């Protein structure tokens, strides 16, 4: 899995002009699923995400997790994280998991994440418009194959 983590003051996702998911302070996740991803990748990602200390404490240090601040997560599927840009000018996306596998894996990821913190989502494979107010900004890349 490849996940772009953005610390946000608020975020929302809309599909065809209708708000699908909306959060206040928390994390916006752009989630890509790879063909080799397994249950252990899912567990690792959830554990890291809910415990990653990237929110400021009273002294201004990044010392609090999304769980500590009682924040929320907006999770958006993003197969383009597996783009291959080595040849030509058009990215190839053959490195991403096939849609059926990726959809099931993304759903399982969100369900497991929702056991820890409130989660809103987009719709897998939909054309979505994502709006966010970055906080920091703080943007982190999590790759479950690099641990």
UniProtKB/Swiss-Prot annotation:
One Gene Ontology biological process: D-amino acid catabolic process
InterPro entries: Daa-tRNA_deacyls_DTD, DTD-like_sf
GO cellular component, one term: cytoplasm
Source domain of life: Bacteria
Keyword Cytoplasm: yes
Keyword field: Cytoplasm, Hydrolase, RNA-binding, tRNA-binding
Segments traversing the membrane: none
Subcellular localization, as worded in the UniProt entry: Cytoplasm
Enzyme Commission number(s): 3.1.1.96
Motif Gly-cisPro motif, important for rejection of L-amino acids: positions: 136-137
Main localization, broad class: cytoplasm
Catalytic activity entry: glycyl-tRNA(Ala) + H2O = tRNA(Ala) + glycine + H(+); a D-aminoacyl-tRNA + H2O = a tRNA + a D-alpha-amino acid + H(+)
Subunit architecture: Homodimer.
Domain comment (free text): A Gly-cisPro motif from one monomer fits into the active site of the other monomer to allow specific chiral rejection of L-amino acids.
Entry-linked PANTHER family: D-AMINOACYL-TRNA DEACYLASE 1 (PTHR10472:SF5), D-TYROSYL-TRNA TYR DEACYLASE (PTHR10472)
Assigned protein family: Belongs to the DTD family.
General function of this protein: An aminoacyl-tRNA editing enzyme that deacylates mischarged D-aminoacyl-tRNAs. Also deacylates mischarged glycyl-tRNA(Ala), protecting cells against glycine mischarging by AlaRS. Acts via tRNA-based rather than protein-based catalysis; rejects L-amino acids rather than detecting D-amino acids in the active site. By recycling D-aminoacyl-tRNA to D-amino acids and free tRNA molecules, this enzyme counteracts the toxicity associated with the formation of D-aminoacyl-tRNA entities in vivo and helps enforce protein L-homochirality.
Protein known as: D-aminoacyl-tRNA deacylase
Organism listed in the record: Streptococcus pneumoniae serotype 4 (strain ATCC BAA-334 / TIGR4)
Lineage: Bacteria, Bacillati, Bacillota, Bacilli, Lactobacillales
């Amino acid at each position: 899995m490849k996940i772009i983590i953005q610390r946000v003051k608020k975020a929302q996702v809309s599909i065809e002009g209708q708000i699908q998911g909306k959060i206040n302070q928390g994390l916006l996740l752009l989630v890509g699923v790879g063909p080799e991803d397994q249950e252990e990748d899912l567990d690792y990602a959830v554990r890291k995400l809910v415990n990653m200390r990237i929110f400021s404490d009273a002294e201004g240090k990044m010392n609090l997790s999304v769980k500590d601040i009682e924040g929320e997560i907006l999770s958006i599927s993003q197969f383009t994280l597996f783009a291959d840009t080595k040849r030509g000018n058009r990215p190839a996306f053959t490195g991403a998991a096939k849609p059926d596998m990726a959809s099931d894996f993304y759903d399982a990821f969100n369900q497991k994440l929702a056991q820890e913190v409130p989660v809103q989502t987009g719709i897998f494979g939909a054309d979505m418009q994502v709006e966010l107010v970055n906080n920091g900004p703080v943007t982190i890349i999590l790759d479950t194959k690099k641990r």
